[in-house]
Design a protein with these regions (language model features):
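Long, hydrophobic, amphipathic alpha-helical segments used as structural scaffolds
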Residues: 67-74, 131, 138, 157
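Conserved FAD/dinucleotide-binding core of flavoprotein oxidoreductases
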Residues: 44-45
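Long, positively charged, glycine-interspersed low-complexity recognition regions
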Residues: 151-157
């Protein structure tokens, strides 16, 4: 109670995913409760919800985990030590979700496997394109990709 904050849920996102079997009275009670707590509520089809969270919530956990594994260079202690000293806000921001609770990562994987796999495959395609840009020294295509990402990011953040 001492650590409670009245604004804890202000503007937090809550997605309600009613189905044909959802009790409308219960849905209304939840809606009122979440709105009264200051939440930003939306209603969505459960299938679309699961696809969206696979892309914007679940996939980043596994990508960040891979990033951490990539830079944790056990075979080269000097590189590992210097990387640890140089890692700053960019690395911290990018890797934060990869350092989370492994049990949560497994639960998400088990409960949204198909959508997460689709997101991973799409990511692999995108990173392969970047890899090809590097191999071909095609800085123009790489710049185009980075510009698009900068523009598209505004849709999410």
């Amino acid at each position: 109670v001492n650590a409670g904050k009245i604004e804890l849920f202000n503007n937090s996102k809550w997605v309600l995913t009613p189905t044909n079997k959802t009790d409308q009275n219960s849905l209304q009670i939840l809606s009122i409760l979440f709105r009264d707590m200051g939440c930003d509520i939306c209603f969505e089809n459960p299938v679309i919800h699961d696809q969206a969270v696979a892309n914007i919530s679940h996939l980043p956990i596994y990508l960040a985990s891979c990033l951490i594994e990539t830079v944790y260079c056990k075979s080269n202690k000097d590189l590992l030590n210097l990387s640890g000293k140089l890692a700053a806000t960019g690395f911290s921001d990018t890797s934060r979700v990869g350092g989370g609770n492994p049990t949560l990562g497994i639960d998400l994987a088990k409960n949204n496997t198909i959508n997460i796999l689709k997101a991973i495959k799409k990511f692999k395609q995108s990173i392969s394109e970047i890899e090809k840009n590097f191999e071909d020294r095609n800085w123009d295509l790489l710049e185009e990709k980075l510009k698009k990402a900068k523009e598209w990011r505004n849709h999410f953040c």
